[in-house]
Each structure stands twice: as structure tokens, then as C-alpha cells.
Amino acid sequence: MKIKVQTLDGKAGADIDLNDDVFGLDARADILHRVVAWQLEKRRGPARAARERSDVARTGKKFGRQKGGGTARHGDRRAPIFIGGGKAHGPRARTFGHSLNKKIRTLGLKMALSDKAKGGKLVVIDTLELKDAKTKALAGKLGKLDLGKRALFIDGDAVHESFAMASANLIGVDALPAIGANVYDIVRADTLVLTRAAVEKLEARCNG
């Protein structure tokens, strides 16, 4: 698959060949769903357990006599009705993450990239380097590219410092290094923008 390489100013340059094994697959909704669900559950923190009546460190002696006291019947002070007692039906410790085979994770990334490429939502630019790290100037450049409400920029080993500074306050603009490319961020972006370095890194990562 060939695609035009642009600049941040919107000027077209030479073509670049994209590996069909990475950018030419047919996306499957079930694979993308599995990977996104795995990602979201992986970043979710574990549930903290509350202490129930068996976990509370209080005496187990019966509180008062069973009959003749003129008050309600009680067992011990660990009951949920008392201040300092255990929680009734409280949450238990639980982790929400589950495992997913590396081959499925890699396949999901390939399909997410392929979906953007086939849908015309993939843009390849030469570099993210800016002469001046000015937010206003960058916003003007991106407005000419018509990237939609949410754009994801992926660079090589690291996002260029000038672009990272200029785009930090732009709503709907996210930037990641190639190592941080993931299915969730790619799928939710309207447009995916890759640099030449990012294309090389992603192809090496997916075929490695």
C-alpha cells in the first residue's frame, strides 16, 4: 500500500510503501473489542476490601443477656448494627485484569492500523519538528490538515520536544512515541497521524 507523505503545512511529498501485513488487514470487531477490554481492565485498580464482622478485631462475647434486659437481643459487638462493627455485605478484594495472548494483542494493533489506513483516516508526515514551539502556530497548521475532532500523533523513539510543548494545551490532540501505540487510543481517534520514524518502528514491532 502506498500513501503520500505530507508535511505539517499540508504540502505533499514522496510516496511511502506501507507493509500490507501491518496496514492491509481486514479489521475484526471481536478482536478489537477483546484488546480494548483487556487494556481498560488492565489499567483499572483493584477493589479494596471492607472489613466484615469476621474481620473486625473486637470481642466475641455476647453483649448483654438474652432475656430480661429490656432491650433488643444482641450477639457480639462486631455486628454491623454497632459503631465500629463490621460492614454488612461489604466489597471484597478483587482484581479485574485478565490475560490476553501477545499474538492477539499484536493482531489487534495491526487491525487498528489497517482500519485507519483503509478508511482514509491515516496521514503520514515527514517529521513533527517545529521551528517554534508555539501553540497558536501549530493550531493553524493542524486546521489546514482537517484531522477531525480528535487526532492521535505517533512519533518514533520519542515525540519531538517542540511538538510536545506546542500541542500540550490543544484539545483533541494526543501525541505518543511508537512504543506507546495502542489499540484503544488508535480506535477512538478520528485521524491517525504517523511520522516516517513511527511507520518504521510500528512495522518492526508488529513483525518482530
From Swiss-Prot:
UniProt feature, compositional bias: Basic and acidic residues: 47-58
Recorded superkingdom: Bacteria
Gene Ontology CC entries for this record: ribonucleoprotein complex; ribosome
GO molecular function ontology, one term from the record: rRNA binding
GO BP, sorted A to Z: translation
InterPro entries found in the cross-reference section: Ribosomal_uL4, Ribosomal_uL4-like, Ribosomal_uL4_dom_sf
Sorted UniProt keywords: Ribonucleoprotein, Ribosomal protein, RNA-binding, rRNA-binding
Family note: Belongs to the universal ribosomal protein uL4 family.
NCBIfam families documented for this protein: rplD_bact (TIGR03953)
Quaternary structure annotation from Swiss-Prot or TrEMBL: Part of the 50S ribosomal subunit.
Entry protein name: Large ribosomal subunit protein uL4
Native source organism of the sequence: Sphingopyxis alaskensis (strain DSM 13593 / LMG 18877 / RB2256) (Sphingomonas alaskensis)
Gene of this entry: rplD
